[in-house]
Structure formats: structure tokens, C-alpha cells
Amino acid sequence: AWHRLTPWPDTVRGLTRLRTRYVLASLSNGNVALLVNMAKNAGLPWDAVLSAELARVYKPDPKAYLTAADLLGLAPEQVMMVAAHKGDLRASSMVGFRTAYVPRPTEFAPDVERDLTPDPDFDVVATDFEDMAAQLGL
């Protein structure tokens, strides 16, 4: 089932807009084979499919984020981590990444409580990927 997840309705359109100006890559704790299958099945327009697997650690270990930046030939301050999980954003900001929070209120079951309040330290807070593209001038 993980290999065939349906993306959020705004995702492909928003990523396609963002890709006109930025290099887009995944960074997940899932393995590369899983992420490639997910991207292919969902039509996600990644430039690169990266995984914490490549650093041989799991996020939020700083090495996962730093390895991703290094593999893309970028300094940490040139990278923006986009996530619906605040812990992921906080960890990536600790290594110098910029951050964009896109909350997904319906990600979990209705009885699962989550704090969706944006952290004031996040660089961008967007309602979805199309809103994020608009905020970044696309």
C-alpha cells in the first residue's frame, strides 16, 4: 500500500510550479526503492529521490539532512526543508536549512490529536504546496 499512496490534491501542481525555479528532492526515512515507486505511481516531479538510508541514519539525525544537502551539492543554508511534521523542520533548521511548514490536518485519524500551530521560527507557513509556490513568487 505504501508504494501506491495518493498524493494530496495540491501536491503535483504545487511541486510542478516550484520545480520551475528550484531543485526538488524527497528526503524521507523510507528506503530509496519505496520512494522511487511512490514518486512514479503518484507522478511526483522530483529532480532527485533522497532518503535518510543514504546517510545510514534516520531523521532527525543531523547526518540525514547534511548528507542530502551534500549529495545535491548545496550548502545547508541553500536548502529548504518542506514538511507537515514540525519535528522534522526543527531538526533540519538546526543544521542550517530554511523551513516551510505545510500542515496536513487530515493526515491522521480524527481521534489523533496533533498540534498544528505553526512555529514562529519557520520561514514559510503555507496552507498547501500551491500556496507555498505563490508565497515564493511562482
Roles of regions detected by a PLM:
Residues A1-A25, V36, P62:
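Short, acidic loop-to-helix structural element flanking the phosphoryl-transfer center
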